[in-house]
């Protein structure tokens, strides 16, 4: 790094661990499922304004919006955006039981601290990392360090993967980048961006896109005494039974798909996965009738460069091979990207990691390369972006579904963001 070590230590001395923990826990305590992020955004706007970092609430639609703050520099350097999201993937919302089963205590919007661990909805994805970026900006301000460029602080709504379909309509189901896309097209831009999504503080600059596909098969409504049970289940007039014959071919395709679409780049591998996320057919209160329609819902992640229509055509080819008449339709599509021109930003963050932890960052875990994040929209809009955020490295803490952070990781992330911000704003060119 070009930044002087003494300057870094001066800034790091202003990182208040107690205040960081307090802010993160306060944010966790505010429920902010997709579509209801306004109270969480306003808490952060108020927190920044109280510390003389100008911030405002950007409404996207009633009840949901973005938090935007700005730490001004001298005006002759690049603008760096820190970005996180306010909505949570796991919560105590009863609808979450549809996919999560029993709700774990750490998924509730009720923060608790046990020794060096903080539990609660969003502490990993993405409220804890977001608070680190705000605390980094506050430490920079308190230190009096001179920055050439501005730092833009953003917490967006509606990053979590959801899409309206069938009876599930309205703001709670509009996700996968709604807030980020609105923000970037309504005046909030930058030269570079650091997306503070959980990565175990690894550094990546590519993320997957995704498509949601609905598959429908048809049968005949039939009173149970008249139901037949053919040996060939694909000939059943029960739509649920008929749909069951599609699962094995789809799973076989999923195995082929991830091998054929694996994407290799400088941060490792991106392996786009396919997941059967839901199946709906019949009426639970009326099992004495054979259902005439059954729907199955699939997400397929996509590597950079893959067109959504090509994935749909792959699914259609699988369905045609089964001999079962089935309809398929896309109901969400976002593109995957690898950032171009992000090398100086990557170097700055690697240097920040070494400065804080006295070692090089670990290689990116493939699964964390293979997720969706709003990084893709930043890159689509021409902003070089990387992803780097704290998440537990201990596999017993279940980083894929757990919501628990080590305080030490939050503090280290905050210090890394301080160091990266100085390096970018004072030593990188504008884009």
Residue ranges and their predicted role:
Residues 56, 81, 152-154, 327:
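A structural signal for isolated positions on well-ordered beta-strands in alpha/beta enzyme cores
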Residues 77-152, 161-163:
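Active-site metal-coordination/substrate-binding segment of hydrolases
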């Amino acid at each position: 790094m070009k930044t002087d070590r003494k300057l870094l230590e001066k800034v790091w001395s202003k990182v208040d661990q107690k205040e960081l923990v307090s802010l993160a826990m306060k944010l966790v305590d505010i429920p902010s499922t997709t579509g209801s992020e306004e109270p969480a955004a306003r808490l952060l706007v108020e927190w920044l304004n109280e510390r003389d970092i100008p911030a405002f609430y950007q409404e996207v639609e009633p009840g949901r919006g973005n938090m935007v703050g700005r730490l001004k520099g001298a005006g002759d350097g690049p603008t760096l955006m820190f970005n996180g999201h306010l909505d949570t993937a796991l919560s105590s919302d009863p609808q979450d039981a549809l996919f999560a089963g029993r709700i774990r205590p750490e998924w509730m919007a009720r923060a608790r601290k046990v020794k060096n661990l903080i539990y609660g909805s969003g502490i990993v994805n993405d409220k804890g990392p977001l608070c680190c970026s705000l605390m980094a900006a506050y430490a920079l301000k308190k230190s009096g360090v001179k920055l050439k460029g501005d730092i833009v602080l953003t917490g967006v709504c509606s990053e979590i993967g959801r899409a309206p379909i069938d009876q599930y309509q309205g703001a709670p189901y509009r996700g996968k980048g709604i807030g980020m896309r609105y923000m970037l097209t309504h005046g909030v831009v930058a030269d570079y961006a650091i997306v503070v999504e959980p990565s175990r503080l690894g550094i990546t600059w590519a993320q997957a896109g995704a498509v949601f596909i609905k598959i429908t098969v048809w049968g005949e409504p039939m009173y149970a005494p008249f139901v037949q049970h053919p040996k060939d289940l694909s000939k059943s007039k029960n739509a649920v039974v008929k749909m069951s014959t599609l699962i094995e071919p789809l799973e076989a395709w999923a195995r082929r798909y991830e091998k054929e679409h694996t994407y290799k780049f400088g941060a490792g591998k991106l392996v786009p996965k396919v997941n059967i996320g839901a199946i709906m057919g019949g009426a639970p209160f009326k099992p004495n009738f054979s259902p005439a329609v059954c729907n199955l819902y699939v997400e397929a992640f996509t590597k950079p460069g893959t067109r959504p229509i090509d994935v749909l055509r792959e699914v259609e080819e699988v369905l045609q091979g089964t001999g079962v008449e089935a309809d398929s339709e896309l109901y969400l599509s976002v593109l995957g990207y690898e950032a171009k021109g992000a090398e100086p930003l990557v170097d700055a963050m690697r240097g920040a990691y070494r400065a804080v932890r006295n070692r090089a960052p670990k290689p990116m875990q493939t699964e964390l390369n293979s997720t969706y994040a709003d990084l893709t929209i930043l890159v689509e809009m021409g902003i070089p972006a990387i992803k780097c955020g704290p998440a537990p490295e201990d596999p017993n803490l279940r980083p894929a579904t757990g919501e628990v952070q080590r305080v030490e990781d939050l503090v280290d992330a905050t210090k890394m963001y301080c160091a990266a911000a100085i390096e970018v704003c004072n030593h990188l060119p504008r884009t």
